[in-house]
Structures are given as C-alpha cells and as structure tokens.
Swiss-Prot record:
Keywords, alphabetical: Lyase, Purine biosynthesis
Pfam families: ADSL_C (PF10397), Lyase_1 (PF00206)
Name of the protein described by the UniProt record: Adenylosuccinate lyase
Primary role: Catalyzes two reactions in de novo purine nucleotide biosynthesis. Catalyzes the breakdown of 5-aminoimidazole- (N-succinylocarboxamide) ribotide (SAICAR or 2-[5-amino-1-(5-phospho-beta-D-ribosyl)imidazole-4-carboxamido]succinate) to 5-aminoimidazole-4-carboxamide ribotide (AICAR or 5-amino-1-(5-phospho-beta-D-ribosyl)imidazole-4-carboxamide) and fumarate, and of adenylosuccinate (ADS or N(6)-(1,2-dicarboxyethyl)-AMP) to adenosine monophosphate (AMP) and fumarate.
Length: 431
C-alpha cells in the first residue's frame, strides 16, 4: 500500500524485516520443539536462540543466486551461526515456515484492526446517545418518508459495526492457524508435536488437516470479512456525503483552519474524507475476487497464490486500518446541524404525516381503500401546488367529520416518532 494510506504501526508489520523475523521465530521454535523431543541438543538450541540474526539485505543478495526466498533466508541465518546451523530448517519444508509465519503476522495485524473497530464502535455509541432524540427526516428512495432521529441512525451504524466485530473475531479463529506437516501434509519427516509446540508459542491454532499449504478458503473468508467491514464504512460515508449536500446540510465534516476545498472555488467545503473512504472501500472490495481465485490450488500445492497474497494481504489490512482510523475521526468530529434537520422536516408541507392520517381514519372505522383514496389526492395536490397538506385535509369534510382537531394535531405531531426510540436503543444495547 502506498504511504499516503498507510499508518506506521500497521505498515511496519508488513515490512521484509518483520516477515523475516517471523520466519526466524518459527525456525527457532521448531528447533526448541525438536529439543523437547530429545533430537537436538539443548545447548545448540540455546546458541541458535541467542545468535541467529536476520539481515534482510544479505538474504536478498543470496536470493539473487538461489531464486528461492526461503533457501536464501536459511542460508543467511546460517551465516550468523556456528556448527549448530545444521539444525536450522530441520525436517521442514518452506511453506511450513512461510504459511505459519504469515498467520502469525496476520495475527499481529488483526490485533490492530480489532482495536480500530472497537474504537469506532465507542464513538458511534457516544454519538447515538448524544443525538438520541434529535429529529431528522428519514428518506426512502432519496425521498422524504417519515421522521427518524440522528441517534437512531447512529444506533443503526453501531449495531452493524457490532456485527462486523463479531464476524471479525470469528474469522480470526479461521485465519490465525499454522501448519508444519511437511511436503504434502502427512508429517512424514516431522512429528505433529513440532507443529503443536510452534503454534502454541505463537498464539495461533493448528490446522487439523493440511497439504503443503494451509487451505486458501481461510484467506478468502478473511479478505471477504475485511471487505465487508470496509463496505460498512463506505455505506456510512455515503450517508454523510448525502447529508452534507448544500440542499440538505444536516451534517458536515470538520473543516480545519487553513483547509482548502477547491483550487478554483474558495467557498467549497467538501466531504473529502468520506469520499476518500468510499474509494478505499472499492480497492479493498476489489481483492475479494483475487482471494477467491487463490482457493483452487493444484493438488497438494502450487505457488500461484503467493504473488497475489504478497500484494493483497498488506494492501487490505493497511488500507482498512487507515480507513477505520480516518472515518472514526470523521464521525467523532462531525458537525451536526440540528436546526437544519428540523427545518428539512417541514420542507414537504406536512406530507410526511400522510400515513398517520390514513391510519387515524382506519382506526375510526373507515375501510382502508376508502381512507387511502381520500388521503392520496390531498397529498398529490399538496405536492403539485405546494399547499400545506394539513390545510387541504382540513378542507375535506369527509375527513374532518371523522377526525377532530385534536386527533389531527396528533397526526401531525413529529414527536410521535420518538415514542419507540427508547425501545430501539434498549434492543441495540445502548441503554
């Protein structure tokens, strides 16, 4: 991922240095496990643990000759050791190291992402509670429907991110898995105890069955889950973009002193952060196809997935980490124009209360079809003439003979739409 959309902590996880360090840790743990089984002298393992060092530049120099990164790595590490170097990579195949270390690196990335999600959820919780009863216009098909509250909108985002967190925790169990089962997964030259020891010490699980590789359905599920998190962010970002339109202006991204919105138009205050999140989400989601196409490897392995994953996994995790942090800050600092929200409710001449009038007529004994056919023409006339809907209703004796002034007052009371907000919040776990 380019530096522009990378945060240092996450980017450092995907450096060559950290990758080789993870490989080295797997190699050393394997030696320790062999030693526990009495196969490698403990003194040799101690020397390996103390003296083995990673030199990325040297490993890459060797790779120019070997054309094999793991062989180059093991030879570079061996250069830092004495006779004990013969135990490095003992009984292992390259992917025992690469796949297990990759899962360990992904685990490091996951710990950051999980904290990112939890922080965003906390901000959404605060926003939901702060604007619990702030009335605003609910829209369906982009058209005014009925009032809701900005707090309910935030509660919706909150519950969606809680689901994302649950899914993320589930996929962590699938992806944070190692394998050290040899060339075709049969443990022909390495006992299962080695795998168990290494994975236990890395804090990851073991694959119950593997080939030379971990199966890539795990990685496809992982990428799809991260893409769904990103897509939720895009959904929220698009809502902010729509609510910041000049004609609506119910919210606005924070605009810093000295910030510029346009090189040509000095007045511009654009939702560039939310637009940025929209674009990043597209990039992340685009990797789903790559992840799924990595699943059908040949027989017990090929490396067609390798080149794709070297690009895909850093890109997706780094981009999502960036997006989560940036969008959390956007929502946290969001300006909310409560007066505009209330004013927008009145822009459609009271038409948004048409269902309340319809239901009131039905409750007083009118057949639904008759009630609908009496209310709709008044609604259409209000649309076309910009006449207040209630004014037209009050001129129709077939309606006023059924509904009293007090009953009409209740029909046109926007506060009615707050009646179940407490229930919604309770169901969302936002008490």
């Amino acid at each position: 991922m380019i530096d522009r959309y990378s945060r240092e902590e996450m980017a450092n996880i995907w450096t060559d240095q950290n990758r080789y360090e993870a490989w080295l840790e797997v190699e050393i743990l394997a030696c320790e496990a062999w030693s526990e089984l009495g196969h490698i002298p403990k003194e040799d393992v101690k020397k390996i643990r103390q003296n083995a060092k990673v030199d990325v530049k040297r490993a890459q120099e060797i790779e120019q000759e070997t054309r094999h990164d793991v062989v180059a790595f093991t030879r570079q590490v061996s250069e830092t050791l004495g006779d004990e170097r013969k135990w490095v990579h003992y009984g292992l195949t390259s992917t025992d190291v690469v796949d297990t270390a990759l899962s360990y690196v992904i685990k490091q990335a996951n710990e950051i992402i999980e904290k990112d999600i939890e922080r965003f959820i906390k901000v959404l919780e605060e926003k939901a509670k702060n604007y619990k009863y702030t009335l605003m216009m609910g829209r369906t098909h982009g058209v005014h429907a009925e009032p809701t509250t900005f707090g309910v909108k935030m509660a919706l985002w909150y519950t969606e991110m809680k689901r994302n967190l649950k899914r993320f925790k589930e996929v962590r169990k699938e992806i944070e898995v190692g394998k050290m089962s040899g060339a075709v997964g049969t443990f022909a030259n390495i006992p299962p105890e080695i795998e168990q020891y290494v994975c236990d010490h890395l804090g990851i699980d073991t694959a119950s069955v593997s080939t030379q590789t971990l199966q890539r359905d795990r990685h496809a599920y992982y990428i799809a889950t991260l893409a769904l998190v990103a897509t939720s962010l895009e959904k929220f970002a698009v809502e902010i973009r729509n609510l910041q339109k000049t004609e609506t202006r119910e919210v606005e991204e924070a605009f810093a002193k000295g910030q510029k919105g346009s090189s040509a138009m000095p007045h511009k205050r654009n939702p560039i952060g939310s637009e940025n999140i929209t674009g990043i989400s597209r990039v992340i989601r685009g990797y789903i196809t790559t992840a799924y196409e990595n699943v059908p490897l040949w027989h017990e392995r090929d490396i067609s997935h390798s080149s794709a994953e070297r690009i895909m996994l850093p890109d997706v995790t780094i981009a999502l980490d960036y997006a989560l942090n940036r969008f959390t800050n956007i929502v946290d600092r969001l300006t909310v124009f409560e007066d505009n929200m209330r004013n927008n409710i009145d822009k459609t001449f009271g038409l948004i209360f048409s269902q309340r009038v319809l239901l009131a007529l039905i409750n007083k004994g009118m057949v639904r079809e008759e009630a609908y056919d009496r209310v709709q023409p008044k609604a259409m006339e209000s649309w076309e003439t910009k006449t207040p809907f209630r004014q037209l209703i009050e001129k129709d004796e077939s309606i006023t003979n059924v509904l009293s002034k007090e009953e009409l007052d209740e029909c046109f009371n926007p506060e009615h739409h707050l009646n179940q907000v407490d229930t919604i919040f309770k169901r969302a776990g936002l008490e």
